[in-house]
Amino acid sequence: MKRRLLPILMTLVLVCALPIWAAFVTSGDVTNPLVCTAGASPPPEPVAVSNAADLQNSIADGKSVKLTDNITITSTLEIARSLTLDLNGHVLKMTGDGSVLRVSDCATLTITDSRPQNPHTGSYAGLPAGGVITGGKADKGGGILLAGGCTLKLTGGCITDCHATDTGGGGVVLNGDTAILYMSGTARIENCTAGETWGANAIFNSGTMYADGGTVDGTVNNQGTIRLSEGAAAETVFNGTVYNRSAGTIKAGRYNETVENRGTITGGTFCGGVTNDGGKINDGAYETVKFNSDNGAQAKEEKVLRGQKVAKPTDDPTKSGHTFTGWYLGDEKYNFDTPVTAPLTLTAKWEKVPSSGGYYYYHPTTDTKADDTKGSPKTADPGVALYAALSILSLTGLTCTARKKF
């Protein structure tokens, strides 16, 4: 009886527990480690706005917005709650004083552009296509001023013609070591200015910039960190001088103009070169180029700053019985004007010198000097040898005949 009772009791416990378990795993409770997103509602659609008043009010309420027309504002848009601003191919222009956007209170502002190819007409015809943020003028951060603890995710749109009257970033300022900028996609910063030429026309960074894509035209003052997000498929392209200050670290990015380095460089691609002014460049910023002579000698290695060109060796290698024809990368002759962006092994190619076989004779056609020896063979000539032998035999025969007669 006891053996039968135990399985029955276990079955009853299981049946009673199933409804409770089902309710638990489908509750959507974020503390549930198995199904933490069940029942979660999607984010609300952005509010369509076509004028400054609706834009200001929606942002004040913490609502994401989508521009449906060009909008002119006269005062800074204060972002104190996390939201998304979709420029949607339109122009957001500041005509008063101050930054166009200021992010505070640990908020996250995401800027997107649903229509990056949308052309502009009329008074905006000279602006780049797509969504545009323009006209800001402030002490620092003419376009966007990002306070410490805040995050800007710039995935699209163009920040252009914004100005900082001081040295701090005509385009974007990361004001504090806890400010974070993610730049990616089609985002661009261009034609911005700052009060000091050594300052930051485009970006003044005291925090962390994730250079995951987009383009920056103009100078950058880096006193924080420039790096990549984990798994990022692209890098931001910097087309102006970058001043890497003593507190600055560069770990990623493509730099088409000079980087003036007083800080630390551990990675990146430096097509414009680096001027090192007391800074440090770690091995991670270099690539190794091997020269394999294929002549029995040990391959030579050279460290090249990533993005720079490797110099062609001044002396060609040598190999007995061969002529050197050049350095090759795979099956193609290497172009030494190519920037090095990855490890390379260059191999010497050789052409075998053809060997000459048989006898070599010297047969002059004219007698240019009295003391020249005509017809002098360089090696034994069978014809000449035969002629000499017959001559000797003939003389010997004549001698013998003469002796018999006497």
Description of each model-found segment:
Residues G383-K404:
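A cross-kingdom C-terminal cell-surface attachment/processing module
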Residues G89-D97, S114-K140, T155-G168, S184-N201, ...:
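Beta-strand-rich solenoid/repeat architectures in extracellular/passenger domains
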Residues V30-T68:
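Acidic Gly/Asp/Thr-rich repetitive segments characteristic of extracellular carbohydrate-active
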Residues N282-Y360, D367:
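Secondary-structure capping and domain/repeat boundary segments
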Residues A53-A60, T72-R81, L85, L181-M183, ...:
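Short, T/G/N/S-enriched strand-turn elements that build extracellular solenoid repeat scaffolds
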Residues K369-Y387:
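Extracellular Ser/Thr-rich, low-complexity/disordered mucin-like segments
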Residues V49, S58-I73, L83-H90, T325-Y328:
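Glycine-rich repeat segments that build the extracellular carbohydrate-interaction surface of secreted
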Residues T72-T84, L92-D113, G126, I133-L152, ...:
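Extracellular beta-strand-rich solenoid/capping regions of secreted or surface-exposed proteins
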